[in-house]
Swiss-Prot record:
Similarity remark: Belongs to the V-ATPase 116 kDa subunit family.
Bilayer topology term: Multi-pass membrane protein
GO molecular function: ATPase binding; proton-transporting ATPase activity, rotational mechanism
Name of the protein described by the UniProt record: V-type ATP synthase subunit I
Key word Transmembrane helix present: yes
Entry keyword set: Cell membrane, Hydrogen ion transport, Ion transport, Membrane, Transmembrane, Transmembrane helix, Transport
Main function: Produces ATP from ADP in the presence of a proton gradient across the membrane.
Subcellular location: Cell membrane
Annotated GO CC locations: plasma membrane; proton-transporting V-type ATPase, V0 domain; vacuolar proton-transporting V-type ATPase complex
Organism: Deinococcus radiodurans (strain ATCC 13939 / DSM 20539 / JCM 16871 / CCUG 27074 / LMG 4051 / NBRC 15346 / NCIMB 9279 / VKM B-1422 / R1)
Pfam families: V_ATPase_I_N (PF18670)
Key word GTP-binding present: no
GO biological process: vacuolar acidification
Length: 690
């Protein structure tokens, strides 16, 4: 649900404003809204206030850049030094850290030069010998393809220099490196000849550019030989500095952020000569905390709390407040979506119910479900040990709280996958069918699904694996008999959610007294429902004559739906002239849910192929075939799962983001996230802004 908000206006004496703002930081409940106009000063600070803000921001930037250069995660909390020592603490860490960062950068640059040019420079040094120390001889190195001819270069040099040059070359890796030796006075002519031959001079980057080739080769040799050890030593030095300065740096950084936040509050408030006024929003259940905070200041503070007008107030922040089962989905899956508009519909619980259900229908494999369950339990184990997950390959770090939510969501999805795996009879594809655990019971299938007009053969042998322990009740791999049933089953979710979405549109329109959206929702609800009935009555276009059977209640309901669409469209034609086009589009939205069947069937077929290949090897080659079958089958399953898993996760999320939430109006408007003013540093140690 969306937490109900209350709007707050606070007026405070200017001399008490710093203490009040600091107390509001401690309370951590007020979401500030800028005051943009009025008789009092608003906007950027000026004078002494602006100077103090610039100084605090400068020191904060210095602290944050130092922490970034240290590459340290937040350590355990440390005491905050006295405010007078903050600059000393920051500069005391920044100077050695910046010097170390410069050395690390230079070493990294040298290692990169050696990786790129090292072999070529050593080859050039061998070719020129001691000529690179001669004052009379100029050396012009160059690079050319290993298979290219030097004839064009030789012709250009002979034309420019006559016989006052020599060229040597050597193949190095995929290229050929060469050098022109000529008189110092002819250096520019040799370079011009290189350009004429469409070649460029080989110039080394950085400090190596001015070195003789022999000296550069020796230096790059030292870099190659000792570079890794030097890098480890520098990294160890960085770790030592992080342990030495990190705790105090983080403490000062947090305190500086709090001070800058105080300046920010001033900037978004209305300022007079003797007073300061601010406005914002507080969740209704946290009003007592705000009142308790402000009551300590007596008559130095005056405030008023009044309800938010959810129909007309703009920029009211949103805080989603769900509990129990829904919360992990709010913190993970809903993070991929925008926030709902304040006063509208919170779809978190719908997502929490249907996304794992759809994922389970798509995967529907006990083996895969057990793998997901193991992964989810591993995530929960790390969270219980208060360990994070460093995904440095992706430049991310997942804290324990995030792992706890991800582990819960993964386990729910695994549970649905295992449940549907029992219904489809799939364990890593058809492995349990081969082992005689699952089997096709035609009599049972006829009793379950015969009402649809589908009939499985009277003899059990016609059903494939005819004996076993557990019967298959949702045989999606039997596409000949069950394909249409599975497809319609998937489309039923589309019918439910698309109509539900337009029903929410009507409900929200009534709630906000928005007649245009009420009639739009009614028109689309009736039109989409009529299209669905048209498809069922005509059997997907195979029997249009049934549409004229007015004795069928479904035909009358279909006509009522089209009438409702026409009436609704006439009421909102000016606002929504393309509503008939949208109606066709919404029919497509219902059909989009067929991907639950289609993607799931592809997943099942791929898993079946992987298992059948491994099983056939085990049957044909004997004991060695069993080993090969297990290894090859496992590798193929891993490969298929790695290629398709992301798509299987995203498909249910997409269905909710587009097909379900578009009709509700969820994607049309959003509200800012509730971000209350909070303190980062300990309340007792924070310095006051003067």
């Amino acid at each position: 649900m969306i937490s109900p908000m209350q709007q707050v206006v606070i007026a405070v004496r200017k001399r008490e404003s710093d203490n009040v703002i600091t107390a509001l930081q401690d309370a951590g409940v007020l979401h500030l809204r800028p005051i943009a106009e009025g008789p009092l000063s608003t906007g950027n600070l000026a004078g002494q206030d602006a100077q103090e803000r610039r100084e605090d921001e400068r020191l904060l930037a210095r602290a944050e850049s130092t922490i970034a250069e240290l590459g340290a995660y937040r350590p355990a909390p440390a005491p905050l030094p006295a405010q007078s020592e903050w600059e000393t603490v920051v500069e005391g860490a920044a100077q050695p850290v910046s010097h170390l960062a410069k050395r690390r950068q230079e070493l990294q640059s040298d290692l990169e030069v050696d990786r790129t040019y090292g072999d070529a420079v050593r080859a050039l040094a061998r070719m020129v010998g001691t000529l690179d120390r001669s004052r009379r001889v100029a050396l012009v190195p160059f690079l050319i393809g290993a298979t290219e001819n030097l004839g064009e270069l030789d012709g250009a040099l002979r034309e420019s220099l006559g016989d006052r040059y020599t060229v040597a070359s050597e193949v190095v890796g995929a290229n050929r490196v060469g050098v022109i030796a000529t008189l110092s006075a002819d250096r520019d002519a040799a370079r011009a000849a290189l350009s004429k031959a469409r070649l460029g001079e080989l110039r080394l980057p950085g400090r190596f550019d001015t070195m003789p080739l022999g000296a550069a080769a020796d230096e790059l040799g030292r870099v190659r030989q000792g570079g890794d050890d030097m890098q480890r030593a520098l990294n160890a030095e960085r770790d030592r500095l992080a342990q030495q300065h990190g705790p105090a740096l983080y403490a000062v950084r947090d305190a500086l952020k709090d001070r800058v936040a105080v300046h920010d509050v001033r900037a978004v408030s209305a300022r007079g000569k003797y007073s300061l006024a601010m406005q914002g929003y507080v969740p209704a259940d946290r009003i007592p905390a705000l009142q308790s905070t402000l009551s300590r200041f007596g008559d130095a503070v005056s405030y008023e709390v009044f309800p938010v007008d959810e129909h007309h107030d703009q920029d009211v922040p949103v805080e989603l407040k769900n509990s129990g089962y829904v919360t992990p989905f709010q913190n993970t899956v809903m993070g991929l979506m925008s926030l709902p508009k304040y006063g509208s519909f919170d779809p978190t619980w719908v997502v929490a119910l249907f996304v794992p259900l759809f994922f389970g229908i798509i995967m529907a494999d006990i083996g895969y479900g057990l793998l997901f369950l193991a992964f989810g339990m591993w995530l929960l184990g790390k969270a219980r040990r208060n360990e994070g997950w460093d995904l440095s390959l992706f430049g991310a770090y997942l804290p324990p709280a995030t792992l706890r939510d991800l582990g819960f969501v993964t386990n729910v999805m695994a549970g649905w996958t295992i449940l549907w795996g029992f219904l489809t009879g799939e364990f890593f594809g058809t492995l349990f069918e081969h082992l005689g655990v699952f089997y096709m019971n035609n009599d049972l299938l006829n009793r379950l699904w015969g009402w649809t007009g589908v009939h499985w053969g009277a003899h059990a042998a016609e059903g494939g694996h005819s004996t076993g322990l557990l019967p298959i009740v949702f045989p999606r791999l039997d596409t000949e008999n069950f394909g249409n049933i599975a497809l319609v089953f998937a489309l039923c979710f589309g019918i439910l959610q698309v109509l539900w979405g337009w029903g929410i549109r009507v409900q929200q329109g009534l709630k906000h007294n928005d007649q245009a959206h009420v009639w739009e929702g009614l028109a689309m609800f009736g039109g989409v429902g009529a299209l669905i009935l048209l498809g069922f009555i005509s059997k997907a276009g195979a029997d249009f004559g049934a549409l004229s059977n007015f004795g069928d209640w479904r035909v009358l309901l279909m006509i009522l739906g089209f009438v409702l669409f026409i009436v609704g469209y006439l009421r909102v034609a000016k606002q929504f002239p393309l509503l008939p086009v949208e109606l066709v589009s919404q029919g497509g939205s219902v059909v989009s849910y067929a991907r639950i069947f289609a993607v799931g069937l592809v997943s099942a077929i791929l898993a079946k192929l992987c298992t059948d290949l491994g099983w056939s090897l085990s049957q044909q080659i004997g004991f060695l075939g069993i080993i090969l079958g297990i290894v090859i089958g496992a590798l193929l399953h891993f490969f298929v799962l790695a290629l398709t898993l992301i798509g299987h996760i995203l498909q249910p999320i997409r269905l909710h983001m587009v097909e379900f939430l578009n009709p509700t109006g969820f994607n049309n408007e959003t509200s800012p996230r509730y971000a209350p003013l909070r303190r980062l540093s300990p309340a007792s140690d924070a310095g006051q802004v003067k």
